[in-house]
Amino acid sequence: MGQKVNPIGFRLGVIRTWDSRWYAEADYAKLLHEDIKLRNFLKKRLFNSGVSKIEIERAASKAKINIFTARPGLIIGKKGAEVETLKKELAKLTDKEIYLNIQEVRKPELDAQLVSENVALQLERRVAFRRAMKKSVTSALKFGAKGIRITCSGRLGGAEMSRTEWYREGRVPLHTLRADIDYGFAEAKTTYGIIGVKVLIFKGEVLPGQK
């Protein structure tokens, strides 16, 4: 089962926490849809900013959104002008008071979501899939990853029949719950169809008492 389950969902409550942190009873469905709408909007709006993760915290009439990005300067803008514009756009989607917290991803080479998006972007630019995979694997290991696995599925290289190719280096223990494994998924929209890119990065084991 470790092969099929989402590595982040599998570790929730053990070494990972939820990306949406709030509690609701009657309004649960409404707030869940609102979260999805906010995430989709931010992903589309900040497409070129290298957004890795979006966390949403809610309390009464306030919503705090933490955006983890590789390029915080693009989101913040000159003297914070871009952030203010973004806040106003988000306020139209929800009736809550919005607080934005922009956090920098120091090593984008070790962030599975950013790596998968980078590989997908290269595939869209017609870079050979093996070269794109190998390049990302090499740079992740260079920046201190203990192991990495990249999987590409679809009509690779414009082949008639779709297939799955993967490349792994180092250790990627999928069953070990204390293993800190980051997971990312992206889609490359090529002229032949969509190619799915999955990335698993093993950063080491989280021992009891550590965060």
Curated annotation (Swiss-Prot):
UniProt xrefs under InterPro entries: KH_dom, KH_dom-like_a/b, KH_dom_type_2, KH_sf_prok-type, Ribosomal_S3_C_sf, Ribosomal_uS3_bac-typ, Ribosomal_uS3_C, Ribosomal_uS3_CS
Domain of life: Bacteria
Keywords from the named record: Ribonucleoprotein, Ribosomal protein, RNA-binding, rRNA-binding
Keyword Flavoprotein: no
Residue ranges occupied by any KH type-2 domain in the UniProt entry: 38-106
One GO location term (cellular component): cytosolic small ribosomal subunit
MF terms in GO: mRNA binding; rRNA binding; structural constituent of ribosome
Gene Ontology terms describing biological process: translation
UniProt cross-references to Pfam families, sorted A to Z: KH_2, Ribosomal_S3_C
Physiological role: Binds the lower part of the 30S subunit head. Binds mRNA in the 70S ribosome, positioning it for translation.
HAMAP family: Ribosomal_uS3_B
Protein family: Belongs to the universal ribosomal protein uS3 family.
SUBUNIT field: Part of the 30S ribosomal subunit. Forms a tight complex with proteins S10 and S14.
Protein name: Small ribosomal subunit protein uS3
Organism of origin: Geobacter metallireducens (strain ATCC 53774 / DSM 7210 / GS-15)
Biological classification of the source: Bacteria, Pseudomonadati, Thermodesulfobacteriota, Desulfuromonadia, Geobacterales
